[in-house]
Amino acid sequence: METIAKHRYANSSAQKLRLVINLIRGKEVSKALEILTYTNKKAANLVKKVLESAIANAEHNDGADVDDLKIAKIFVDVGPSIKRIMPRAKGRVDHILKRTSHITVVVSDR
């Protein structure tokens, strides 16, 4: 049985998140949680929360055994960018893009 968890509009760029999700793709959830715990990146914390949510969803909604779960799919899509300006010298401005992402984790007991 496949179970999905999503975090939409995560405050991190897709490029930074993809560095982390590539470490855990296809692994067992216990091993993936261990890897994320010791990965020293902000994105690792975001991905860990979504993975824990997917595990809880599988356990509560589908009655799955946590020890049998593996990461079936994990991907990051680009979300909308929030546009900000930063004033500079001589009346100019720099444009700042605050990037967001959508994290999707699918766990399966097969």
UniProtKB/Swiss-Prot annotation:
On whether Translocase is a keyword of this UniProt record, the answer is no
Q: What keyword terms does UniProt attach to this protein? A: Ribonucleoprotein, Ribosomal protein, RNA-binding, rRNA-binding
Molecular-function GO term, any one: structural constituent of ribosome
What this chain does, per the entry, is described as: This protein binds specifically to 23S rRNA; its binding is stimulated by other ribosomal proteins, e.g. L4, L17, and L20. It is important during the early stages of 50S assembly. It makes multiple contacts with different domains of the 23S rRNA in the assembled 50S subunit and ribosome.
Describe its assembly.
Part of the 50S ribosomal subunit.
NCBIfam families, alphabetically? Answer: rplV_bact
Name the PANTHER family on file: CHLOROPLAST 50S RIBOSOMAL PROTEIN L22-RELATED, LARGE RIBOSOMAL SUBUNIT PROTEIN UL22M
What is the protein name stated in its UniProt record? Answer: Large ribosomal subunit protein uL22
Species name: Baumannia cicadellinicola subsp. Homalodisca coagulata
Q: What taxonomic lineage is listed for the species of origin?
A: Bacteria, Pseudomonadati, Pseudomonadota, Gammaproteobacteria, Candidatus Palibaumannia
The encoding gene? rplV
